[in-house]
Amino acid sequence: MSGKACLISCSDHYDHRLRAWDRGLRQLHYSTKYLTSDFDHATKVPFVCTVPGCVQIHVTPYQKNLSIQRILSHYQFAQRVTAYLETEQPDVIVALLPPNFLAQSLARYKRKHPNVRLIFDIFDLWPETFPSGKSKWLLSPVFKVWAYLRNSSLPAADFVSTECDMFRDILHLGANSRAVYFAAEPTPVASLPDLPEDHLSLCYLGSINNIIDIPRICDLIRSASRMRSVRLHIIGKGEQQQEFIDAATAAGADVIFHDAIYDAAEKQRIMDHCHFGLNILKPSVCIGLTMKSVDYFRHGLPIINSIPADTQRLLQQYGIGVPYDGDCAAKICSISLEENLAMRHQAKLVFEEKFTEHVIQHTVDCILNEVVRCL
């Protein structure tokens, strides 16, 4: 097998999602090109991609996630990517969704070039993941259009992979689909738990944004602090970080704010002093697995979980945490050191069995062998 392949991500998720597809295609002797925009959608500034051979597509900058400028930027990316593909004429296309404009453009390209193999990888279910509220109600007509752009385009793909099985169920995907979980490398240092006995130590890891459920986290802290003193380690940052710190402190937690930490050994050191990781999002958020969950498991930290579907099943099957419910505070305050260590052991095993780069690479390789074998 040999040919040309294009991998596409508007928001530059090469490391999180596309690296495995790139490796798999190269193993099948495809030459690959990676296409992304020249605008960082998180920091809202232009950037230079460091992936070797990357082709960056110029788009209009924007500052607000809900704005006409963002819609225009995503539309430009979809149109300019398609124009590039007309010149490049690849044999295989792997595209991350959203943006949903990209799904529509690539579906049209597939109909025009039926011999190309098209794979959609859905890493976010937009607009379903938008937190509920007045804005979602007001924007529901627009959101329906956005969802239609994606849903009407999926049948054009030869294969659809999703971030979690929950997305497959919601989209009613069939046999030509499969969940491909987030991949991560094992931590470079061993976990050496040193859990405090005089207080309950919790960890929050990740972005502090509008989808985390600060009120429910604070309710948990408030209930637990009636039984034991509570310390909260925050590893991350975001637009709501001060609100989170203030609310957790008011609820009774001794808050230690570490800011964002990218060094795995440093994160391991902090988590070795924590009993549980917080995996609590707003109920309206449509997601079955978070990157923070994988990172908690990577470090051997059991979780307090409100996420349904995939993550809930992992808790039930492997005993790697406690579900967020009315008895949650009492449960986490009464769990013994031995029980916590057993959960930590299980969390590490789950990571090694389901989320290492080796495991995810095998999944991707199986998909590629099936989808491109006829080329």
Q: What do the PLM-derived regions correspond to, one by one?
A:
Residues 1-53, 159, 219-226:
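N-terminal subdomain of nucleotide-sugar transferases
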Residues 23, 79-83, 101-104, 108-112, ...:
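Membrane-proximal helix-turn-helix segments that form the acceptor-binding/catalytic region
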Residues 36, 119, 127, 140-191:
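Donor nucleotide-sugar binding/catalytic pocket of nucleotide-sugar-dependent glycosyltransferases
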Residues 61-69, 116-148:
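Acceptor-binding helix/loop patch of EC 2.4 sugar-transfer enzymes
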Residues 184, 193-212, 217-222, 232-233:
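Conserved donor-binding/catalytic core segment of Leloir-type glycosyltransferases
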Residues 212, 258, 263-269, 277-295, ...:
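Nucleotide-sugar-dependent
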Residues 242-268:
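Nucleotide-activated donor-binding/catalytic signature segment of Leloir-type glycosyltransferases, i.e.
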Residues 327-373:
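A charged, aromatic-enriched C-terminal amphipathic alpha-helix characteristic of glycosyltransferases
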